[in-house]
Amino acid sequence: AAFLWKRYSPSKEKYDLKKYYGIEQEGQLAITVNNQVVEPHGMIADGKAYIQYDVVRKYINSRFYWDPDENILLYTLPKDMVSVEVGSKDYMVSKDKKSEDYVILKTEGSTAYIALDFISQYTNMEYEVYDNPSRVMIVSDWGKTTVATIKRDTQVRYQGGVKSPILAEVSKKDEVTIVESEENWKKVRTKDGFIGYVRNKDLKNEETKTISRDFEEQEFTSISKDYTINMAWHNVTNSDANGSVLQKIAESKGLTTIAPTWFHVKDTDGNMDSIASADYVNYAHQAGLEVWAAIRDFDGGIGSNDESLQLLSYSSRRENLINQLIGAVMQVGIDGINVDFEKISKDCGVHYIQFIRELSVKC
């Protein structure tokens, strides 16, 4: 009987929580986001929780953008750009200066850490910081979720099975979130960020409920037309070729939009060449057409994916290109911009998206 008891009795072994969270050195902050323990790429500094930029983008809010070359953090709002410099308590919302009572952005080498308080200003999330070990529980998934109540004081184990080490103790009436169901065990998340297993018989009142919080999401508007858009490319290679617009319009029946190839990226500093024509725009408007001028990253000074990356990965270079583009648009009365970039590598994708965001704000 003693042998059987030893074989089948629950283990009292405690799991190494630093190992569980992946903590390898002092000062690291473990992170649980919704139902996932992620790499401990956080830290506590001056009493504030900071999360590494890569974790923020991947798990919390992908709209944050860090430029390590120019040491600036950006966040795009519908009509404004938020910018933060390293080590500062101040930040800009377009031209308006605002301040917090903590340093918003810290760096270690080229790695950026963003204050969780600042992240939460722009993210529909809740979080709580706990000790022993230092960890943060972040909830950002809202809507329907399955929960249950702990029936009696018990343990959350690392894996399903009574011989698996204990992660945490839970008390009668505690509520846990159900992550997965197995035959005799359920994978659960505790309110303080442990994800492990509890026996089915130790749970009761399983139910699906809707969780939410008060948060005013930013409204990103768009433009739509009440007609079918029929657009023609107009390959314009020099200023003289702009004179062929009337012939182009006459040859194309049912057009609503024409896209002349007027703008070409000149170099990796964000300068551009333009052959835009106000007369061309006037002729098109008289014919009832909108002009959506194209900007290209080819047939100009950019000749490779690497050069497009050099251009778009620097915030000042994107800004230079956007300012020149908007200036030309306003000068000749263009109705829209057609971005025709074809030298975008996978590594450049995040920078290209940021370019489009910044361009949309200026538009």
Where are the language model's segments positioned?
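Primary recognition of N-terminal secretory signal peptides and signal-anchoring hydrophobic helices
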Residues: 1-182, 212-224
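Extracytoplasmic/secreted proteins, especially bacterial periplasmic and envelope-associated proteins
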Residues: 51, 55, 114, 118, ...
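Conserved, compact domain cores that house catalytic/ligand-binding motifs in diverse enzymes
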Residues: 167-180, 190, 230-287
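Boundary/entry segment of secreted carbohydrate-active catalytic domains
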Residues: 153-155, 194, 199-246
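Conserved glycine-centered beta-strand/turn positions repeated across beta-sheet architectures
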Residues: 168, 180, 186, 195-198, ...
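Chitinase-like catalytic core of GlcNAc-active glycosidases
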Residues: 226-235, 264-363
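SH3/SH3-like beta-barrel fold
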Residues: 75, 173, 185-190, 198
